[in-house]
Amino acid sequence: CAPECRSFCPDQKCLKDCGCI
């Protein structure tokens, strides 16, 4: 996922919209 998404989900799988699984 994109870096800005990782800040939201550091140790979860990120979705394309930066959501978490």
From Swiss-Prot:
Disulphide bridges: 1-18, 5-14, 9-20
Keywords: Disulfide bond, Nematocyst, Secreted
Principal subcellular localization: other
Domain of life according to the entry: Eukaryota
Subcellular location: Nematocyst; Secreted
Coiled coil: none
Signal peptide: none
Job of this protein: Peptide of unknown function. Does not exhibit antimicrobial activity against Escherichia coli and Staphylococcus aureus. Promotes cell proliferation of human fibroblast skin cells. Does not exhibit any effect on voltage-gated ion channels, including potassium, sodium, and calcium channels.
Protein's recorded name: Peptide Hact-2
Organism from which the protein derives: Heliofungia actiniformis (Mushroom coral)
